[in-house]
């Protein structure tokens, strides 16, 4: 759900 390290 986070935009951080979203692959």
UniProtKB/Swiss-Prot annotation:
GO BP, sorted A to Z: neuropeptide signaling pathway
Secreted in keyword set: yes
GO cellular component: extracellular region
Keywords: Amidation, Neuropeptide, Secreted
Positions bearing Phenylalanine amide: 7
Principal location: secreted
Cell location: Secreted
Residue stretches in coiled coil: none
Family: Belongs to the FARP (FMRFamide related peptide) family.
Described function: Myoactive; induces a rapid concentration-dependent muscle tension increase.
Protein name: FMRFamide-like neuropeptide PF3
Provenance organism: Panagrellus redivivus
């Amino acid at each position: 759900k986070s935009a951080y390290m979203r692959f």
